[in-house]
Amino acid sequence: MQLNTVIFDMDGLLIDSEPLWNEAAAEVFKMYGVSLSDEQYHSTTGLRTKEFVQWWFRQFNLGDAEHARAEKLIFEKVMMKLETKGKVMPGVQYIFRFFYERNFKIGIASSSPIGMIDLAIEMCGIKNAVQAKASAENLPYGKPHPQVYLDCATSLDADPLACLCFEDSFLPD
């Protein structure tokens, strides 16, 4: 089967957002009296914001009442940081042009919310090339579960076996 579709992750691959997620999480957790070390933060890199917040709230016995508020605040702070100091990763426009000129179907599959995916597409200047986007935000399982990639492939009317996927994060063992 010939490859005819390419699906990209977003955070850390298209935009340098990981440090911004770290900053936003640090600011929000500080409100709850928690300071995460770099090692602690990196041990949960790749989790969806909801899972990240739930994990650390459990670890620090912060209770369940504030989960949704903390998650919302982190997302709002990341969006503001992306707008003011977000950076597009080197080579993004080149690689999108490469696949676009070869008539590949192109999609983005991310754990981030759709609003952030839309902002990243705008920042990268790739709106005309992206034909589908999928978020794992409301899926039963986040990455590394492949559902978000399968959903994106379905949106592109692509056979998953004909897809080339670019992903930079793997959860630790």
Residues covered by each model-derived region:
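Helix N-cap/coil-helix junction residues
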Residues: V34-L36, L62, I126, A158
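An amphipathic alpha-helix signature
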Residues: N22, A26, T49-Q54, E71, ...
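Helix-loop "lid/cap" segments that line or gate small-molecule binding pockets
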Residues: V28-F29, R48-G63, A120, A153
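Glycine-rich phosphate-binding loop signature in dinucleotide/nucleotide-binding domains
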Residues: M1, E101-F104, L156-A162
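Active-site neighborhood of HAD-like aspartate-dependent phosphohydrolases
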Residues: M1-S43
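Substrate-recognition element of Asp-dependent hydrolases with the DxDx(T/V) motif
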Residues: A25, V92-I121
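Substrate-recognition "cap/lid" segment bordering the active-site pocket of phosphatases
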Residues: K85-K87, P113-D173
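Metal-dependent phosphoesterase signature
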Residues: F57-Y94, R102-F104
